[in-house]
Amino acid sequence: MKYLSEMNRMYSVSIGITTNMGVSATSWIAQNADSLDARSIWVGEDIALGQETFVLTANTLSQTKKVRVGTGIIPVTVHNIVTLARVGITLSELGDGRFAFGLGIGGIQDLERHDIKIRKPVTELRKTIQTLKRLWAGETVDSESEVFSITNFGLNLTEPLKMPIFLGVRGPQMLRLTGKIADGVILSGPFDYLKNAIKIVDDAGEEVGKEKGSIEKVIWVPTIPTFKGIKEKVARRVVALVIADTPDAVIDMLNVDIERVEKIRATVAASSPKEGAEHVDDELLDVFSISGTREHMVDRFEALEKIGATEVVIGPPFSGDWRGATTEIFEEVRMRMRES
């Protein structure tokens, strides 16, 4: 079999999993990712739900041989910075160069649900990344922020640790920060927003001397293959949650029914995404997700490539015959790569 990575292509296809998925599902993905020819498996953390994040990431690394495995993302607001530094060492060694550390502040809904408030999120993320980089460089560090404080701490490394750092961010200031200090960005949102976000990241990278296009752009939006049994109401429920978690700065960029968006947000906040889904129409479904037939979904992947995406992530949600759907989507991508 000739793998996609050996072909002339501009974007890669990966698979996303979250801690709230069952072990049988995450293990199937890990055990089949190499043969599917996925570029990466990204592990998203649902705060305080399901499997332990770093155990799941380590298990995924141990079940794969070729694919990159990354966290996408770890909220720095809920983990001790010393733990994060040590996790980086452990997973980097376990993955033998295949681990990527994806970090961020955390989703709006998750942070509010756990009563976590950060006054200056951009400053917090910047300080965290700077401190982690210094620790991995072998320095003994004094540093503090809103959520951490360390004094005279070092990791006693025999040599500097190097691994790619990805940031999961949304707002303009966060995007500029990512372009300047990270190796890649994990983005989610509507196409119009993504196009603008990619430009902000690239421009910021060039400002600090990075080569044009050198920053990886990973796009992770809900992918909902309705051609294999996943019900459309599941898709609408997912989109309702996404809309509720989307910042105003992103919504303001879109040509959508703002009154409907606010109704969805209010309903999700007052009850649940299930009730909010009743207000998600076809337009919003198409704006905030990639769904439909495998051909249509891969068409959307290719559209993302045209606006600068280097990697597109499949899933979650996983429902219906998602194993068959995932396999067919990768088959469609391979077929198009061969024909191009």
Predicted regions span which residues?
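Hydrophobic faces of well-ordered beta-strands that scaffold small-molecule active sites
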Residues: 11-17, 41-43, 69-72, 99-103, ...
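Active-site mouth loops of central-metabolism enzymes
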Residues: 11-24, 74-81, 159-170, 223-224, ...
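N-terminal beta1-alpha1-beta2 module of alpha/beta enzyme domains
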Residues: 1-72, 163
